[in-house]
Amino acid sequence: MPELPEVETVARGLAQVWDGRTLVRVECRRPDLRKPLPPRFAERLTGRRIERVGRRAKYLVVGLDDGLVLLGHLGMSGRMVISQGRNEPPGRHDHVEFITDHGISVTYCDPRRFGLLDLCGRDELSAHPLLAGLGPEPLEAGFSAEMLAACLAGRRSPIKVALLDQTLVAGLGNIYVSESLFRAGIAPTRPADSLKAAEIGRLVPAIRDVLTEAIAAGGSTLRDHVRPDGELGYFQHSFAVYDRAGEACPGCTCDIAGSSGIQRIVQAGRSTFFCAHRQR
């Protein structure tokens, strides 16, 4: 599932062709996504000018000139694909197509149909069921060691599991939590409330750095993620521990023969990768 860097990459790609443009046609070919499309979906969007494409957690947020907001989640396999003057017939998984006044087509393609598109008023956005209760954005200025320490207080769950809780920090997922904990030198199995102030002080900038670098690389393409312009993400080539079980982590001095290198365990049904030598 796309995490914060992948969704941010998609939002930035869409902003380049959508910001300030008018939707002249919206074609809905299959309304039964994870959540059915809202009534009069195409009608309510047609003729509206897009003011800004943004992101909240793992959701695309598209503000329109009449106060309406298009909210999107890519699910497991969803993509937003940009094309100019598209002439070929739509593919079987091309469920919604948005055409702007300068001839650009953006197609929502989702083979597994776990994604969704919804509409709500701008004033209702923060209370939308998908967004209400989300934690702070880790790349915003207010996300600090003090804030994270307060969130972790009293939490006995492993720190890896705690950081995946979207009410604690918004947008983090399996890949980037594993990478951030490695950079901070913190074992993923540690109880969240056992982290000392100095450790949290390392973790916050580690989270920021990992996310910033991943966005700069266009996200991580492991299976489905593709940028709107068709390019792949490249941060997977910079993974220190994720999906590298049995290998040596960068700069590690442990005995691979004795330690088996990077370890993989399962936490809350998800794979966790870490170096037991460098993460305590």
Task: Identify what each model region corresponds to.
Residues 22-40, 54, 149-280:
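Basic, nucleic-acid-binding surfaces and adjacent catalytic neighborhoods in DNA/RNA-processing proteins
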Residues 70-171, 176-183, 191:
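Phosphate/anion-contacting hairpin/loop surfaces
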Residues 1-117, 142:
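Gly/Gly-Pro- and Ser/Thr-rich, intrinsically disordered tail segments characteristic of DNA damage-repair
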Residues 36, 47, 57, 78, ...:
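Glycine-centered flexibility motif
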